[in-house]
Amino acid sequence: MGAILERSECDVLVVGAGIAGLVAAVQAADRGMKTIVVCKGKIAGGASYFPGKASLGIQVTKGASDYELFKGDIAQVAKGMNDPAIVDAYLTDSPHKISLLNKIGFRPWLRGDNRPACFARHPRDIFMISDWQEASRNARAIIGSSEHIVPFERSSLIRIQTDSGRIVGAVIERDGEYVLIRCKAMVLATGGLASLYQHNLYPGHLYGGGHATALEAGCQLVNMEYIQFIPGLVAPKNKVLFGEHTLKYCTGMVDQQGRDLFADLSPSASEALFVERSAYAPFSCDYASQIFDIRMMEAIRAGSDGVRLTFGANLYEDRSEFYAIYLDWLKRERGIDMCVDEIRVAPFAHSCNGGIRIDEHGETAVAGLFAVGEVSSAIEGANRLGGNSVGGALVFADRAIEKAAHYRDLHECSVSFDEMARDFQSWCAQFAAIESTCTATEVLKTVRQLLWINANVLREHRSLSDALARLDELEAAYSPLVHGFDAYHALAVAKVLMLAMLGRRESRGAHFRADYPNADPRVYRQIVAFHAGALEIRRDHQ
């Protein structure tokens, strides 16, 4: 184990430097709070700034008359899986938080068309952001010029430390050594977990470390089975977001051998299927067009490297804003013409609708520990409306800092650095006897393959159980003290995903069980927590 060479102290520790983390940091700095920002890469990284997409939207409540309509749209796709108090907080605050994007270097604009967001039934204001490189440069300049913010780049969260149910600090790894950070409040903004999948639309380091450390610290996870899978390009270039709206002009889908995957449908039925699927991005079993994603994954399981889509020339004749932004970006930045190039797609892991359980202030079950952005389970449920992800990051990062300021004023940490060091050393002792027979690279590669095939759009008991057994074997043969904590956290979160998917024996929203294809009339959420030292999943009936 590396030595503890550094000790730092702050009012608020922010872990993560995407949109949620940066908003938390600048809002804390505005309150005069000494803030440390820890991130695995550089400031302004993570999924927020991933360049494999043209733009991001932020959907906000459009006046008092829209309040109940928006709430209904959210409820329609949440399917009883979300928290009404958190939804109300978003509906109230979202119109007033767009300016927070300017504070971290973006230049948002209001979209000009009246197209409803993905899954939404009603149109409302949608603000857009893009220009990821410029926004990243701006954010780094903003953080670098703040007298209240200290960045810890290329650093990883290893352990969250608590005392009597309150946050006291964390252990960070930087350059092979450990750093103790004592704080009065902590904001987790570590993002999602899509990097656990072989094909994903995220940077390569999002393994769910925030989820794993929060769970060990006493937090609960909820809705972890609900992961969004969005078609992404595997050719002509890999890991590029596919614009689902282009399916309106799709003329066919074939596997690698050229077999028509909808040969059993009439031409009019195929056309209707593509049109319906063009209205939403993430897979959902709530629509008849679910067979688009299911047959795509069946072809992949049978050996196809994605499926090929063909398009009519009228695709490029549609110059409405939603089409023009994507198609122009695709040609300009990626050199792809969807009517000329061979377009092959597969289901890519994207956002996690579940995460750390929070209240309407972003606070977890641990006092003073907050979770914001994708690491949290916010307004999402079984699925999420387009444009609510970034909006949720803005609303709850701001709310978290407002509440964190009270801990700065009220809470004096009674735990010394020496006590924190002893706690960490005692925790590490559990790994000393493990004889590590596999490396982090081997573990992560295996995890990604297991989840890609067994915990994707298609799920069933046998494949999930077999994958879980393999994860147990890997965990028993891996020592984080020898090969690092990334793979340790990845294994922990992958096991949570498998258990949650096994536990929900029904199909709902983003979760499809081929062996349980219908929805259960009973509505419940699955809560994951440690109880008496063991991982436990209980049902919280709504």
Q: Each predicted region: which residue ranges?
A:
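Glycine- and aromatic-enriched mobile tails/lids
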Residues: 1-3, 8, 27, 33, ...
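N-terminal Rossmann-like FAD-binding beta1-loop-alpha1 element of flavoenzymes
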Residues: 12-37
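Glycine-rich active-site loop/strand segments that organize a redox cofactor
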Residues: 57-89
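Glycine-rich loop(s) and the adjacent beta-strand/alpha-helix scaffold that form part
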Residues: 185-240, 383-403
